[in-house]
Regions:
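Short beta-strand->loop
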Residues: 20-22, 114-116, 134-161, 175-179, ...
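Extracellular/periplasmic juxtamembrane helices and adjacent flexible linkers that interface
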Residues: 243-325
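Periplasmic-binding protein-like
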Residues: 104-109, 169-176, 182-184, 216-249, ...
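Short helix-loop capping/hinge motifs at secondary-structure junctions, enriched
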Residues: 117-123, 142, 155-163, 242-250
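Ligand-binding pocket segment of bilobal, Venus flytrap-like solute-binding proteins
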Residues: 160-227
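Bacterial N-terminal signal peptides that target proteins for export
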Residues: 1-9
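Sec-exported extracytoplasmic/periplasmic mature domains
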Residues: 33-42, 65-69, 78, 85-89, ...
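N-terminal segment of the mature folded domain
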Residues: 15-143, 285, 292, 318-321
């Protein structure tokens, strides 16, 4: 890794970065960007502007492939960045090895949000497949968070006594029969549940769940932590060809490295992301509920296998999701 915030020769001209990110990171990167621009200006004298683009992770990846000139991407899952590499050649295939922890500076998991008092008595994944329970989750075709939601439910079903791919598939089919609408991204699903009042339970990123309950409506909503869920690892990457074209490689790389500093890790914890830094994680351990967690590598063999089996055209999701049934 190059030295963090290394001085640049003649780094006085203003620069602009575009961070193309997934749906519920707006608040996180607003604070990260403010901290980084201050640190960078103090170190180099260069003023920078960091612009943000947010949406469903899969949709955002397609926008970059189609020409949105991101200097960096901070998406919901590695498969979306793999697609940018494979389809557009904008960064190397082994991009994930360039930063610590598989290029995931922080993690999250998948939990539930219910209405105050939990009138449907939602306690675990099994409750989401009961008749009469309306579940809000985004579309796995466009949302990275939705894919994590799906895989968390699949892993739970698979790990139950007697669980198999067949029982997990039936479990997911029953779950999606309870989903009345599929938004394109996680923030849209939160709006559907929180503002439009649809659904009994929202499957959500942990950070999005706490944002909704603690900062938007603690008198309206509460978080339910299931017995088991998945370690969600949102990765970050330099988009080499775009950064080189814009002359922003050095500052873009420094920005990504900044995400691993104690300052940025504390900002992540403030916004309910689980810090990867051991010291900051220990300081915020009480802020995050404890539950049994599994990884995508353990259960699905990694993102490439999961994407092909479940979310590519003709995959399991296409077979089980039948609106109107």
């Amino acid at each position: 890794m190059t030295p963090l915030l290394r001085p640049l020769a003649l780094a006085t001209a203003a620069a602009t970065l575009l961070n193309v990110s997934y749906d519920p990171t707006r608040e996180l990167y607003q604070d990260v960007n403010a901290a980084f621009t201050k640190a960078w200006a103090a170190k180099t004298g260069q003023r920078i502007t960091i612009n943000q683009s947010h949406g469903g992770s899969g949709k955002q990846a397609r926008s970059v492939i189609d020409g949105l000139e991101a200097d960096i991407v901070t998406l919901a899952l590695s498969g979306d960045i793999d697609a940018i590499s494979a389809r557009a050649g904008l960064l190397p295939a082994k991009w994930q090895a360039r930063l610590p922890r598989n290029s995931s500076p922080y993690t999250s998991t998948i939990v539930f949000v219910v209405r105050k008092g939990n009138p449907k008595r939602i306690r675990d994944w099994d409750d989401l497949v009961k008749p009469g329970v309306s579940v809000i989750t985004p579309n796995p075709k466009t949302s990275g968070g939705a894919r994590w939601n799906y895989l968390a439910a699949w892993g739970y079903a698979l790990k139950k006594p007697g669980g198999s791919d067949a029982t997990a598939r039936e479990f997911l089919a029953r779950l999606f029969r309870n989903v009345p609408v599929l938004d394109t991204g996680a923030r849209g699903a939160t709006t559907t549940f929180g503002e439009r009042g649809l659904g009994d339970v929202l499957i959500a990123w942990e950070n999005e769940a706490f944002l909704l309950t603690k900062e938007v409506g603690p008198e309206k909503f509460e978080v339910v932590v299931p017995s088991m869920s998945i370690v969600a690892e949102p990765p970050v990457a330099l988009v080499d060809r775009n950064a080189d074209k814009h002359g922003t490689r050095a500052v873009a790389q420094a920005y990504l490295e900044f995400l691993y500093t104690e300052e940025a890790q504390a900002i992540a914890a403030k916004h309910h992301y689980r810090p990867g830094d051991a010291k900051i994680a220990a300081a915020h351990a009480a802020d995050f509920p404890r539950l049994t967690l599994f990884t995508i590598d353990d259960v699905f063999g990694g993102w490439r296998k999961a994407q092909k089996a479940h979310f590519d055209d003709g995959g399991t999701f296409d077979l089980i999701y039948q609106p109107g049934r």
